[in-house]
Structures are given as C-alpha cells and as structure tokens.
Swiss-Prot record:
Organism of this sequence: Thalassiosira pseudonana
Similarity field: Belongs to the PsaA/PsaB family.
Any single GO CC term annotated in Swiss-Prot or TrEMBL for this entry: photosystem I
Positions of chlorophyll a B1 binding: H653
GO biological process, one term: photosynthesis
Keywords, ordered alphabetically: 4Fe-4S, Chlorophyll, Chloroplast, Chromophore, Electron transport, Iron, Iron-sulfur, Magnesium, Membrane, Metal-binding, Oxidoreductase, Photosynthesis, Photosystem I, Plastid, Thylakoid, Transmembrane, Transmembrane helix, Transport
UniProt-recorded name of the protein: Photosystem I P700 chlorophyll a apoprotein A2
Residues the entry annotates as binding chlorophyll a B3: M661, Y669
InterPro entries in the record: PSI_PsaA/B, PSI_PsaA/B_CS, PSI_PsaA/B_sf, PSI_PsaB
Length: 733
C-alpha cells in the first residue's frame, strides 16, 4: 500500500480526516518537527535547499533575458530609450477579439506586454547593447542554475554532507561570507563596471572577443602599482557627455563627482565603480578579522562575553548570547530577515532618490512599480523577522544559559517596553487622526482657512543641512561659508548641490504640512505594527494570563473551554494581526510616494500640497481620481491597452473580499456547512457513488485565518499593483 501524504509525519499520515492534508501542507516546511529529524540532518537539508533556491532565481532571471531577447525590443529601445516603450514579451493568446489585438499591438507588429521592471535600464547601464548579448547572458545563467542544482543534490549525498561542527564554526563562516560573498562579489562588480559598463557608456564595445586586449584606462596598471591612484580619477566624463557615445567622454574610471549624469539623470558610473571598490576593500579586510586556524584575530565568544558594562546595569551583559545564537536557527533567521528587510526598504528609497540606472527616472511607471515592489517585500521580511524571533523564544530559548543577560533582562521588563510602545502609538494615533478629522470638518463646512497646518521645520532643517537651498535656512551644506561646504567643494559637493536643488530630480523633495501629517500617520502604522510584533515575541513564552504558554507551541487557537480568555494570544496570532497592520502601513507609504510623485510629474505639486491635509482629499484626489483609467479600461464599446490592468484591479478586489469570508465566519459555521453537504452528497443518486478517502472536516481556526490572511494580502497587493501601473502609465505613457 502506498504511503499516504505526509511522509514526514506518521501520526498525520494515519489521520482519517481531511486535516491530514491541511496539517501536512502547514507543517511541510517545519523541518525540525518532522519524524526522525536530527539536528545535523536539519542543517544539511536547509544548506542543500539554498542551492535549489539560487538555481530557481537564476532560472527566473535567465527567462527574463531570454524572453526579452526573443520577443522584446531591446535593440530598438537602446537606439532611443526615451521614446520607446520596453516590451516584456508578446501576448500569445489575444483571444479577446479584434479590439484587443489592436489595443495591445500599439506600434508593434504583434500584441505585447509592456515591462515596468526596470530591466531594460539596468541591462543598458551595465553594458548590454544587443539581443545576442542577452541570449548569451541567458544561457550563462541557465548553465549556472544547472550547476547549482547539481551542487544541491551533491551536498545531500553522504560523502558530501557537511558536519554539524562545520555549520557552527561562526568565525570561518564570517570570514568567508564577509570577504567572499560581500567583498569579492563587490570587487567583481567593480571589475565589470570598469572593464565593460564604463567603456560601453563611452561607445566602446567590450565583449568576450576583446576584453583581454582592451584596457579600461589609457595608463593601464602603472598608476596602481606606483601608488599614483589619482590618475584614475582625472579627466571624468564632461557634463555634455552623450551616453553610449564618445562625445564628451573622458577616461576616468574611479571618481567622486557627486550628483547625476546630466543626460541620463542617473548616478555617474565611475562614482558607482569607486563605491563598489571601497565596499570591496572594507569587506575583504573585515573577512580577515576573525580567529580561525592561525590563532590571531577576534573570537566572537570572547567579544560577547566581554560586553559587560562596568556599572553592572546590564547584569551579565552578552554572556550566553554566543551559544544562544549559534544553536538557534530561528534566531539567526530572524536577524537575517530584519537586516534584509531594512536593506530592501533602503533599496526602495534609493532606487528613485539616487537613481543608479540610465533613464530610469524618466520612466515614471517603472519607478513607481519598483518603489512599491520593494516596500512590500521589506514589510513581509520585517514581519517574518519578528515571527521567527517569537518561534525562537518558544522553541530555542534557554533561561539557564541566558540567566541575567541582556536577553533575559529584556524579557523581565517587557511590560515597560510594551506599555511605552502602546503610549507612543496612542499619542500618534489620536493626534494625527485628530488633525486630519479637524481639517476634514472645516473643509467640509467651506472654511479651509481654519485647517491646522504644521510646517515640518525639523525635517526642512535636515534637508537644508544636506544642501537644499529653497528653505533659506543657511545651515551646513546650504551655507556657502560653512566649513562642511568648504571641505567637499573640490570633490563631490558641486555635483551633489546641483542635484539636490534641481527640480527635475527626486533628491529631497520639497515638503509641507501634508507631508508632516502623512509622515505621522506612517509613524503610527510602524509603531502599532512594532507593538504587536514585539508583544507577540515577548509574551510568546508566557504571560500573567497564561504562564505556561510556551508548552502550547507557537500557534494554538485556545486552551479549550476550560480556560476562558486564552483565545487569540498565541505568538502566531500576533503575527497574524501584525500582517494587517503592516499591509495597512505600507499602503500609506506607497499612497504617499505615488501621489506626491504623480503631482510632481504632472507639473501640479500644488494638488498634493492642498488636498493631502485632509482624508477626503486622499480619497477623492488620489484614489478616486487616479482610478479612472482602471474604470475606463473597457466598456460596451470596446477596450484599450489598460484593460488588462482593469481586470487585474477587479480580480484583486475579488480575492481580497474572499479573504473576509474566512476571517469573519469561524470554524463551527464551516463544520456545519460541510456536514450538511456530506448529508446531501450521500443521498444524491450517482453522486453518492463517489466516496472520499478522508472524512471531510473544516479547517482549524488557525488555518482558516491563514487562508483568509493570504487572500487578503494577495488581493490587496494585486489591486494596488494594477492601480499604480495603470494610473501612472495611463497619464505618462
């Protein structure tokens, strides 16, 4: 007899009800809970899966390159980046009739899907110029994906499985990851920029055929070996340089010009090469700092154990943290997710403010899509960090090992942490909403002059300190006499000051009362999300209400009818609630960014400045006004090339609304419904010839909530993605 799913849990495989399937799916990735799992085997499986993960990523990027080379218009776009709309791929099956064929063929021989990914700009910036090069890149990544799949399989074979001690050798891992993963990859990227991208931007082709014979700098390596490095910064591209040609180009490869290339409005390639070289040096040095074979360098345990403030106010300090972090994968994952979440959000900010790719800042829809995309990913990563932090407290935390150290002391004064976060959230919520509602009321009664409008003075001061002249604060970089200005005047400052005060760039946008209010609304969302997540993690082991909570695991619905009030207090419930707040907050962040930019791009920043001070302004002048391209994507008379986004907009709403069906009605309702359907099925001729192997039962409360949350999240994001793309491309096509 075939073994039933799931093979990793004999107890579940023998369950006679449909919960076998749902619990099987729910615990498929909870590797440490699987039958017969040892710690060593767990580490080995996770390690091998990393190769598979990388293979999938490279296969995906290979597909992007292949489809653009095959069905896109990359070469045409390269010849005129500002006037050509980049194509992602053709639409194979335009079965919606003649009007669809026309709508999606606009200016092309066949119907196509326009790309808003920024890939064209990226490939162009790093030196791609022809479809042939895209094909070669695609095949290269395909081969790399194959190698990684084989490597993943290989590391599961008994001979090639690393030992547990190898996984827990922190110093070796730090050295290799810092110098190898971060240092040498940055050095390799510097090499690519210097040898391929910079020459390409000056009209010089460097490919596999000539890269060994084309020196990136006329002086060769002589300045490097003689210590005369400034030669590499001399004669940079001029302000009149025409990208992709030799006109106005220089010879510099490592510069500190500051600001943007005047034509492409992106960072200077030679500045970026210099930046990556500096990062490479820092990380390669950092990767030689930790003590391994030679008895020299830092030892992490010694460093952590020595971190005990002499006043004794932090107790045992960091004693015990080395063992705790080394032995807890959840703690390590939580830290990694938090760092990656911050980095992803920073990527969202810098992608538009300090645009690295040629002509990206002229492609408004792509900029909006990339910002929104990265902020949502950052939100999921940050919530995941806290979720695994909570799992760490439930499964991996050892009170004896951490006695009186910073971790234990944090748990001991969790009430102070939670109540302070609660106070901050209440303060932000009541004051911000109070101001919005006041402004709404006076505007509704025809007295807009009675609005309470705050000038964001501190933020303006920070902008002025960075060189923004419009506020006339005359401080630091905004003052020509400041020592800070004098220090950078010969190097990067002129380029930076030109960029920060140029109305055509996104660097430090002018702000006012609307920005002040929405900033505090976002702060409210961030603090409430943090409050829920922090409370969930700090109360994960136990609380006054339920001191033995850790014995129930990470996710449990309630402790039966016997203990009233124990529903909704598992660490998983905190994650569940925080997800809604996270999505809510990122909604505010992306609404703010998109609306402010829409008005700037449209030459009407006054609309944002006036309407963003009250809630009706947001609903009417941002959401409703900009949804018109989606509402008019198709009608009884036909359709246009935005109709696909209209359908996605509707479909997103449908998925989102379906979520509430699972979120509002609880398990008993579904169980009764299922029992009624079973009764009807068993009494229906012909239908009752079909029997089920598993007795149908409703999802558990936790599972139904998960299904609801997934629908809510997916629907919410699909709806807003369609809105951003259609409203922006409809206006600025």
């Amino acid at each position: 007899m075939a073994t039933k799913f799931p093979k990793f849990s004999q107890a579940l495989a023998q369950d006679p009800a449909t919960r076998r399937i749902w619990y099987g799916i729910a615990t498929a990735h909870d590797l440490e809970a699987h039958d017969g799992m040892t710690e060593e085997n767990l580490y080995q499986k996770i390690f091998a899966s990393h190769f598979g993960h990388l293979a999938i990523i490279f296969l995906w990027t290979s597909g992007n390159l292949f489809h653009v080379a095959w069905q896109g218009n990359f070469e045409k776009w390269v010849s005129n980046p500002l006037k050509t709309r980049p194509i992602a791929h053709s639409i194979w099956d335009p079965h919606f009739g003649e009007s669809a064929l026309k709508a999606f063929s606009k200016g092309n021989t066949y119907p196509v899907n326009i790309t808003f990914s920024g890939l064209y700009q990226w490939w162009y910036t790093i030196g791609f110029r022809t479809n042939q090069e895209l094909y070669k890149g695609s095949i290269g990544l395909l081969l790399l994906a194959s190698v990684l799949l084989i490597a993943g399989w290989l590391h599961l074979q008994p001979k090639f499985r690393p030992s547990l001690s190898w996984f827990k050798n922190n110093e070796s891992r730090l050295n290799h990851h810092l110098s190898g993963l971060l240092g040498f990859s940055s050095l390799a990227w510097t090499g690519h920029l210097v040898h391929v991208a910079i020459p390409a931007s000056r009209g010089v082709h460097v490919g596999w055929d000539n890269f060994l014979t084309t020196p990136p700098h006329p002086a060769g390596l002589t300045p490097f070996f003689t210590g005369n490095w400034t030669v590499y910064a001399e004669n940079p591209d001029s302000a009149t340089h025409v990208f992709n040609t030799s006109e106005g180009s220089g010879t510099a490869i490592l510069t500190f010009l500051g600001g943007f290339h005047p034509q492409t409005q992106s960072l200077w390639l030679s500045d970026m090469a210099h930046h990556h070289l500096a990062i490479a040096v820092v990380f390669i040095v950092a990767g030689h700092m930790y003590r391994t074979n030679f008895g020299i360098g830092h030892n992490m345990k010694e460093i952590l154990d020595a971190h005990r403030p002499p006043g004794g106010r932090l107790g045992a300090g960091h004693v015990g943290l080395f063992e705790t972090i080394t032995n807890s994968l959840h703690m390590q994952l939580g830290l990694a997710l938090a760092c990656l979440g911050v980095a992803t959000s920073l990527t969202a900010q810098h992608m538009y403010a300090l645009t690295p790719y040629a002509y990206l800042s002229k492609d408004f829809t792509t900029e909006a899509a990339l910002y929104t995309h990265h902020q949502y990913i950052a939100g999921f990563l940050m919530v995941g960090a806290f979720a695994h932090g909570a799992i760490f407290f439930v499964r991996d935390y050892d009170p004896e090992l951490n006695k009186n150290n910073v971790l234990a002391r944090m748990l001991e004064h969790k009430e102070a942490i939670i109540s302070h976060l609660s106070w901050a959230s209440l303060f932000l919520g009541f004051h911000t909403l109070g101001l919005y509602i006041h402004n709404d009321t006076v505007v509704a009664f025809g007295q807009p002059e009675k609005q309470i409008l705050f000038e964001p003075l501190f933020a303006e001061y920070i902008q002025a300190a960075s060189g923004k002249a419009v506020y006339q604060f005359n401080v630091l970089l905004a003052s020509s006499t400041s020592p800070a200005t004098a220090a950078g005047n010969q190097v990067w400052l002129p380029g930076w000051l030109e960029a920060i005060n140029n109305p055509k760039t996104d660097l430090f946008l002018k702000i006012g009362p609307g920005d002040f209010l929405v900033h505090h609304a976002i702060a409210l969302g961030l603090h409430v999300t943090a409050l829920i997540l922090v409370k969930g993690a700090l109360d994960a082991r136990g609380s006054k209400l339920m001191p033995d909570k850790k014995d129930f695991g990470y996710s449990f619905p309630c402790d039966g009818p016997g203990r009233g009030g124990t529903c909704d207090i598992s660490a998983w419930d905190a994650f569940y609630l925080a997800m809604f707040w996270m999505l809510n907050t990122i909604g505010w962040v992306t609404f703010y960014w998109h609306w402010k930019h829409m008005t700037i791009w449209g030459g009407n920043p006054g609309q944002f400045d006036e309407s963003s001070n009250y809630i009706m302004g947001w609903l009417r002048d941002y959401l409703w006004l900009n949804s018109s391209p989606l509402i008019n994507g198709y009608n009884p008379f036909g359709m246009n090339n935005l109709s696909v986004w209209s359908w996605m907009f509707l479909f997103g709403h449908l998925i989102w609304a379906t979520g509430f069906m699972f979120l509002i009605s609880w398990r008993g309702y579904w169980q009764e419904l299922i029992e009624t359907l079973v009764w009807a099925h068993e009494r229906t001729p012909l239908a009752n010839l079909i029997r089920w192997r598993d007795k149908p039962v409703a999802l558990s409360i936790v599972q139904a909530r998960l299904v609801g949350l997934v629908h809510f999240s997916v629907g919410y994001i699909l709806t807003y993605a369609a809105f951003v793309i259609a409203s922006t491309s409809g206006k600025f096509a």
